[in-house]
């Protein structure tokens, strides 16, 4: 089997797409289309994977499956992931470093743990809301 076909078969198996390889794209669910998009992005083993809201259109179970798969893939391959997302639970789970943006400007950055400690919050959603509301750490009630 040629290298490209082996890689397609490998990714199809990993992303649970084997039974869908001959199905037209119009017959795929949102979750299946997301997994196909991941396979297409990973076919050449990139060192950096760019993802924009990768689970936004997915049901909770499928979104969780995709996040788990991405965690495993990153750990096994060493591929860096640049993630754009409004889903702070996803960001907290998948990211080592976070840039918080407001109107296209970086207003804070750090590891999820560092941002949580800096803002005295329990989850990044609260940090995100504080930043969106323009509240600095000093303005947040204890």
Predicted regions and their residues:
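Catalytic Walker B motif of ABC-type/P-loop ATPase nucleotide-binding domains
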Residues: 49-52
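Conserved catalytic motifs of ABC-family nucleotide-binding domains
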Residues: 45
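ABC ATPase "signature
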Residues: 109-110
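Conserved ABC ATPase "signature" region
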Residues: 2-20
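Helical segment within the ABC ATPase nucleotide-binding domain
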Residues: 64-76
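Conserved ABC ATPase signature
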Residues: 24-28
């Amino acid at each position: 089997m040629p290298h490209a076909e082996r890689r397609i078969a490998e990714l199809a198996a990993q992303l649970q797409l084997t039974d869908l390889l001959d199905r037209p794209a119009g017959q795929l669910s949102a979750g299946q289309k997301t997994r196909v998009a991941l396979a297409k992005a990973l076919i050449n083993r990139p060192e950096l994977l760019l993802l924009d809201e990768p689970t936004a259109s997915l049901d909770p179970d499928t979104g969780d499956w995709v996040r788990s798969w991405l965690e495993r893939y990153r750990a096994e391959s060493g591929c860096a992931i640049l993630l754009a997302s409004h889903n702070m639970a996803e960001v907290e789970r998948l990211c080592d470093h976070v840039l918080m943006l407001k109107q296209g400007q970086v207003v804070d950055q750090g590891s999820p743990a560092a941002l949580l400690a800096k803002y005295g919050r329990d989850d990044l959603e609260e940090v995100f809301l504080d930043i969106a509301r323009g509240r600095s750490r000093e303005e947040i009630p204890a």
